[in-house]
């Protein structure tokens, strides 16, 4: 049986139908593109945050190890090592006779180490006595705080030689930020073993 067609009817789409279809298609493509770019930006921010977190944690681990050894003086009789040589809110210099040879080494592994925050470059520097080296970049803040045997905060900074001799623990707070990622802050309290 043959299908009856109306006179004047033509198979196909009208221009209005094509324009409506293209408009819907453009809206869907636009939404998908927006989602793709948002996901990419989120992934980049997440990766940046993970990078700065890892770098801050690694640096905190290094600092903890070296600061914990401040004042090491295993010789008998002791040579009188001064553990905390200089201390203010952004700089800390420590010494310890880690090797037990009676001499404070300034070559790696150094027994006289200075950590300092350089605000103008956003870096944390480590100076083992042979020159400062950046150990952490992209930081927006670093603070040292010093505590005595009763956990009381020692002030004012920089600490006098008398107050530096009272230091039993050091609080460290590092804030880092990379790119447009959210800032990351890590804090630690390090007990000096040799006090």
Model-derived features with residue positions:
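Extracytoplasmic low-complexity repetitive segments enriched in small/polar residues
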Residues: 58, 62-76, 102-103, 109, ...
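Aliphatic-rich helix starts adjacent to a transmembrane/signal segment
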Residues: 2-69
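Short, glycine/small-hydrophobic-rich surface segments
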Residues: 44, 51-54, 67-98
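Residues that act as N-cap/strand-start positions at coil-to-secondary-structure junctions
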Residues: 78, 107-111, 184
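Type IV pilin-like appendage domain
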Residues: 83-156
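A generic fold-level signal
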Residues: 10, 55, 86-87, 167, ...
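Short linear sequence signals and composition-biased patches located at protein termini or domain-edge surfaces
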Residues: 2-5, 41, 51, 68, ...
């Amino acid at each position: 049986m043959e299908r009856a067609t109306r006179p004047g009817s033509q198979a196909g789409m009208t221009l209005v139908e094509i324009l409506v279809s293209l408009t819907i298609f453009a809206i869907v493509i636009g939404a998908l593109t927006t989602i793709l770019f948002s996901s990419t930006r989120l992934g980049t921010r997440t990766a940046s945050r993970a990078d700065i977190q890892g770098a801050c944690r690694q640096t905190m681990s290094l600092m903890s190890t070296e600061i914990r050894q401040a004042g090491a003086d295993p010789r008998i009789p002791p040579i009188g090592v001064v553990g905390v040589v200089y201390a203010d809110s952004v700089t800390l210099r420590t010494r310890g006779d880690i090797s037990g040879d009676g001499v404070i080494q300034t070559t790696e592994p150094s027994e006289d180490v200075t950590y300092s925050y350089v605000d103008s470059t956003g870096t944390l520097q480590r100076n083992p006595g042979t020159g400062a080296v950046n150990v952490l970049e992209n930081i927006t803040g670093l603070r040292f705080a010093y505590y005595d045997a009763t956990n009381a905060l020692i002030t004012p900074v920089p600490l006098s030689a008398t107050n530096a001799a009272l230091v039993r623990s050091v609080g460290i707070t590092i804030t880092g930020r990379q790119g447009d990622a959210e800032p990351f802050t890590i804090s630690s309290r390090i007990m000096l073993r040799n006090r």
